Structure formats: structure tokens, C-alpha cells
Regions:
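Rhodanese-like catalytic fold shared by cysteine-dependent sulfurtransferases
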Residues: 2-5, 16-42, 51-84, 93-128
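Repetitive helical segments and hydrophobic/amphipathic motifs
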Residues: 11-12
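Structural scaffold elements adjacent to functional motifs in cytosolic proteins
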Residues: 44-46
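Short, surface-exposed ligand- or partner-binding patches at beta-edge/loop junctions that are enriched
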Residues: 88
Length: 128
């Protein structure tokens, strides 16, 4: 009986891990930008509002407002699933939500921990 119960528990835990969504890869700013530079398929995506993007952003970033669902989804239709999308926002909340959504849609994504606030705290450059 004990053996059957252990086998059943092992099988159930395996099934749960099969259906679980793989967590989004999240990197600190320095490893994040190193990965962008090393990845020939990289797309650097700033998911803040256009007004925030205009204030400052990481050089080479493309802006696509996560909070404007219609615009974001329309923009995603132009994306290529063979590329990797490196995503950031102001503090990390919007970029994580966007990264989870995009990953569920089959895109390769990497999220930057702490957003552009952490980026600037670490003295990394922005375009104004």
C-alpha cells in the first residue's frame, strides 16, 4: 500500500510539472544588456507609455505600450517567433506581465529585473 501511494504521488507531481508554465527568465540590468548585445536575434522592447519612452530609454529600444492592449496586440502581430524579445519597463511590473503574456503566445522573452529605475541606479546609460 505504501509503495502504491508513493508511486501515485510521484506520478501526480510529474504531471503537475508538465503542465506548469516555464517561468520567464529575468536578468539584472548588466547581464540583461550583455545578453542583448550577444544575441543576433535580439529585439529590445520598452513597454512603457510613449511619454515615458520619450523622457528616456535604453539605446536601440523599440516602444510598445503594454497598457494600451489594442496597440500592443497589433504590434505583436509583426513580431517573429524566431527572435528573442528583451523587455523592460519602469520598475519591472509591466515588463513581467508583457513577458508572461508573450511567452504564453510562443515568443522567446527575457525580462529585465527592476526596470529602467534599476538600470539608472546602476549608472547605465540612457538616451534622452
Amino acid at each position: 500500500m505504501k509503495h502504491i501511494l508513493l508511486t501515485l504521488l510521484a506520478a501526480l507531481s510529474f504531471c503537475g510539472s508538465c503542465s506548469a508554465q516555464t517561468p520567464v527568465l529575468t536578468l539584472e540590468p548588466k547581464p540583461f544588456i550583455e545578453a542583448v548585445r550577444a544575441d543576433s536575434t535580439a529585439v529590445l522592447l520598452d513597454v512603457r507609455r510613449p511619454s515615458e519612452f520619450a523622457e528616456d530609454h535604453i539605446d536601440g529600444a523599440t516602444n510598445l505600450d503594454w497598457l494600451n492592449t489594442k496597440v500592443f496586440r497589433r504590434g505583436m502581430k509583426k513580431f517573429c517567433r524566431q527572435r528573442t524579445y528583451y523587455i523592460y519597463c519602469r520598475s519591472g511590473r509591466r515588463s513581467n506581465a508583457a513577458a508572461v503574456y508573450m511567452q504564453k503566445k510562443g515568443f522567446h522573452v527575457v525580462d529585465m529585473k527592476g526596470g529602467i529605475l534599476r538600470w539608472k541606479e546602476q549608472g547605465l546609460p540612457v538616451v534622452k
